[in-house]
Amino acid sequence: MTPDDPNNGNDTIPILIRELDDPSIDNRHHAILVLAGMGAAAVEPLIRALADASDNDRRWYRAIALAKTGVPAIDPLIAAMEKNTDHEFRRYAAAALGEMGEPAVEPLITAMASDDKELRGVLSRALCRIGKPAVDPLTRRLSDANEILRSCATLTLWQMGETGLPSMVEQIRDEKKV
């Protein structure tokens, strides 16, 4: 293994990533499970594969593998979304983050402080996908000192509809009492 080895010495990762394109759905599901089990070692190669994917099916299976990898993929995925402005890449990366649930909430909210409007939009959609676990952390940001975060929290709770609106309304009522 060399320091510049993109696969961290694991030659099976590229093979498994290619297996995500296999005509057999069983082979694709197997590849997802094995890649997810590899944890952090599979994250960067999967992110590169997601960025290089030529169609939505390929993006979908790479995103699912990243989602199943879980916590080790959160920060690298957000960092990749900040650098890669391709809409489809961001959309599928956000879907992966949204599937990770509660562990992704705080990193997603923190990343919404970005000046990049499109990035904030896809991060918001990921939080909407997470749903209820994101409501309290977003509600706490309604009075954040950062105007962008306040605005993003408000809009995200609004987009959540019945899941986010009651919490937002309660926060506004509490602020009026003070």
Which role does the model predict for each range below?
Residues 136:
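Glycine-centered loop/turn positions within well-structured domains
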